[in-house]
Amino acid sequence: YWKWTMNRRELLDKHPDWYAVNRKGESCHDKPAYVDYYRFLCPNHQGVAEYLAEDYVKEAHKPYVDGVHLDYVRMPDVILPVSLWKNYGIEQKEELPEYDYCYCDVCRELFKAKTGQDPLELKYPMENQSWINFRLDAITRVVDAITKAVKADHKAISAAVFPGPSMARHMVRQDWGEWTLDAYYPMIYNKFYYEGPEWIGRSVKESVETVNGRAKIYAGLMFGDIKDNFEEALDEAYNNGASGVSS
């Protein structure tokens, strides 16, 4: 059963305070980044992890469902794939405040209690490793809560993730190498990054080495990106340890 995780519209009216806030103070509730459907929840708000875990278990518990598949299990893109910059008339050579999440009151207070620093007062937030890790860990805790609940129901769990996972940490605050899922589907859309098919192999290799046998890696390939060198792309994925490919 496939369902978006952090990107949820159904709570706009009931829990407007649950939505992530960027460094400019704008909430995904009423001013989402990039596109109207980017309505991301803050992973640190009390009740968010519990709500999501219960929502997935409700589906996993159905007898005809073998497992759940997470998607949008991350923050909004602080850095978009480079080929998409032109679509929005932007150049993300640095982390721009309107795409940098989350700076809501809950996140600020939790980080300040932990480090003594207000993230809004950091001179270089993109270089502050404590602040980076704080947000990586917040998403991981949500995933852990969902995973624990789903596995208690003896169902499988997988996720669509950004490639890397080094790129995932940098681009969307997604540290999926620390998760404990059964399978990962990194979205290795090579032309999004102006890369050739050999990049697919490098990305798969990093992913396989990261999970180190704990989970399967299925390379998510964009057919339009590989149609002219389809066999080479598949060889790159399989020769570097992918258990399969998806498109």
For the regions a language model picked out, list residue spans one by one.
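Active-site-adjacent "subsite" loops/lids of carbohydrate-active enzymes
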Residues: 1-63
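Hydrophobic faces of well-ordered beta-strands that scaffold small-molecule active sites
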Residues: 1-2, 66-71, 157-159, 184-186, ...
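Active-site beta-loop-alpha junctions enriched in small/polar residues
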Residues: 3-7, 70-75, 162-164, 189-191, ...
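Aromatic- and acidic-residue-enriched segments that line the glycan-binding/catalytic groove
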Residues: 6-34, 72-121
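Conserved, mostly hydrophobic/aromatic
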Residues: 52, 59, 68-71, 150, ...
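Structural motif
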Residues: 62-63, 179, 240
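Glycoside hydrolase catalytic-domain groove-lining segments
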Residues: 97-233
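Aromatic-rich peripheral "rim/lid" segments of glycoside hydrolase catalytic domains that contact
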Residues: 228-247
